[in-house]
Design a protein with these regions (language model features):
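Catalytic machinery of carbohydrate-active enzymes
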Residues: 1-549
Length: 549
């Protein structure tokens, strides 16, 4: 039986999100899967299906030893190694560095002699970064550098682990007694609100997140709960964790409605049972969202602040995301939102309509995205609200570029999605990108020429460095050359030649590869032009209508 260890020293939401990969690995058959997490995440890890063993690191104990002056640093390291002994003394067929951070990379490197293969980043014997999978480069060097990431983390993790996604299988463990209690209580709430034979939908509202930057503003919550309570079709219930802070927040909102809002309190063990019985979860970016994805509960994420929904949004076919327009999102800090209570309720009612032909009318600078799947996995497409066509075209074409460069295939539905923006807009955008590529190719050829001349003339080295720096600036651009340039930059940092000649040869190879990759973009732009020429109407996304409450 194959033995797999997943190192996941990330946050609680990432532990739950890893269940997608764990389920896919288990679907391959005859595999024993273990995970390494921080001790505070052990309860979440133990709730995941298909886990044989959960190993933990007590980081608080290690931090105490490291920070207390009466102990030597050696004591902290000794404690860490003691906690790692059971893992190191086993043989693993595959170790997956799910963390892809410094600590996870060190630990993956520490046990590399105990495994036949490491998926993800690790350090070699000379303490140099090693990457044995091009998708790891995508994860670490491209997705992290692009605010509008073209690929979801879940899909990238599957590629890193060389595992196809499996849509079949249970991902989280639930307790039958807890399931029955939750079903009975929530059904009682439904019956109590039933009028004229209409069975109302129970909508769970998650209040708090791990960061105040992502929390739903209390006034926004009050506004959309007020509107929900006016509708005979909706029953809002507040979801909280069992702690005094969240209780006080929930009580404040409930008191605003004369205690007329149901509050459901659940811990990590009972949360899956509660979510399984809801008709919809309205939530900011939380671990609760990831649990809902595992239970099959529909999710409407209200994405605010630092929430990176394009790469860590809800992972399910029926997911919706309500956000301020992408060009107004900073993803780096707090920002006032244009989302209103009416936007939320209109979107909720849209979710429960069968045909989805009438789109909700949203406030200015607010966009509603829906989840779709293609050959790369999940992505989000605007279905209503304010849309910047150039931003959407660039975002989708970057996804197309990733597909071509990393898996040598085009995604036909992306061309169809871009067609919705209108022929003239697409044509002008493509012309501008071709102009950008022309300038990029000039800089690339200048860099290549300086490199070759530098082999014969040492005084040309400064010219090469200057040209290379100019070329690498494209890695910070918002142009289509960004993805291939980031890929080039990532590979450049991995060059390990021992002589100037070896390094020069490797750089030359990478420059020619970069040139080839950019030429592929020109082919994609030509295909886009041909597809856009078939468009007869303008932007279908703006065809919206108001949903009455």
């Amino acid at each position: 039986m194959k033995k797999v260890l997943i190192i996941n020293l990330r946050r609680l939401g990432d532990v739950y999100s890893s269940a997608h990969l764990i389920n896919s690995i288990a679907a391959q058959g005859a595999t024993q899967i273990s995970v390494l997490v921080y001790q505070e995440s052990a309860k979440a890890a133990k709730s995941l299906q298909n886990i044989s063993e959960v190993f933990t690191i007590n980081r608080q104990e290690i931090i105490t030893l490291k920070s207390n002056k009466i102990f030597s640093d050696v004591d902290a390291f000794s404690e860490l190694f003691t906690q790692m002994n059971e893992i190191k003394n086993q043989t693993w067929d595959q170790v997956i560095n799910y963390s892809n951070d410094t600590v996870g990379t060190y630990l993956a490197s520490y046990i590399q002699n105990s495994t036949g293969a490491i998926s993800g980043v690790y350090y070699d014997s000379q303490h140099l970064t090693s990457i044995n999978n091009k998708w790891t480069l995508l994860f670490n060097d491209i997705l992290t550098a692009m605010p509008l990431a073209p690929v979801h983390f879940v899909d990238c993790y599957h590629k890193i682990a060389s595992t196809p996604y499996s849509f079949v299988g249970e991902k989280i463990i639930t307790s039958p007694p807890h399931n029955e209690i939750a079903r009975t209580q929530i059904q009682t709430i439904r019956i109590a609100h039933e009028t004229e034979g209409i069975t109302a939908k129970v909508v769970g509202i998650q209040l708090k997140t791990s960061s105040a930057l992502k929390d739903l503003p209390s006034e926004l919550v009050k506004d959309f709960i007020f509107l929900m309570k006016k509708s005979s079709e909706l029953i809002p219930v507040i979801l909280i964790a069992p702690n005094e802070y969240e209780r006080s927040c929930a009580n404040m909102i409930s008191e605003h409605f004369d205690d007329g809002v149901v509050v459901i309190e659940s811990d990590l063990v009972t949360l899956p049972s509660v979510l399984s019985n809801l008709d919809l979860l309205v939530t900011p970016d939380t671990a609760t969202k990831h649990v809902a994805n595992l239970t099959g509960t529909a999710v409407l994420e209200i994405s605010l602040g630092t929430s990176p929904f394009l790469k860590q949004g809800p992972y399910a076919q029926n997911s919706l995301i309500l956000t301020d327009t992408l060009e107004t999102r900073s993803f780096a800090g707090a920002h006032p939102t244009s989302i209103t209570g009416m936007d939320v309720v209109s979107t909720v009612l849209y979710f429960f309509t069968a045909t989805k032909t009438i789109k909700p009318l949203l406030s200015p600078n607010v966009t509603l995205y829906a989840a779709r799947f293609d050959q790369l996995g999940i992505y989000y497409y605007p279905v209503s609200g304010s849309v910047n066509p150039k931003v959407e075209i660039s975002r989708l074409m970057n996804r197309q570029i990733v597909s071509v460069l990393f898996q040598s295939s085009e995604i036909e539905c992306i061309y169809a999605d871009i067609k919705d923006q209108g022929k003239n807009i697409v044509s002008k955008w493509a012309d501008k990108e071709r102009s950008n590529i022309t300038q990029f190719m000039r800089d690339l050829l200048a860099t290549l020429r300086a490199l070759l001349q530098g082999q014969n003339r040492k005084d040309n080295s400064l010219e090469f460095v200057t040209s290379l720096g100019r070329l690498l600036n494209y890695a910070n651009s918002n142009e289509l050359t960004q993805v291939p340039c980031l890929l080039f930059k990532g590979k450049l940092e991995l060059i390990r030649g021992t002589t100037v000649e070896e390094n020069t040869r490797d750089v030359e190879v990478l420059l020619h590869e970069l040139k080839s990759n950019v030429l592929k973009i020109l082919v994609l732009l030509k295909k886009l032009d041909e597809t856009a020429a078939e468009v007869r109407t303008g932007n279908a996304v703006t065809k919206t209508a108001e949903v009455n409450i």
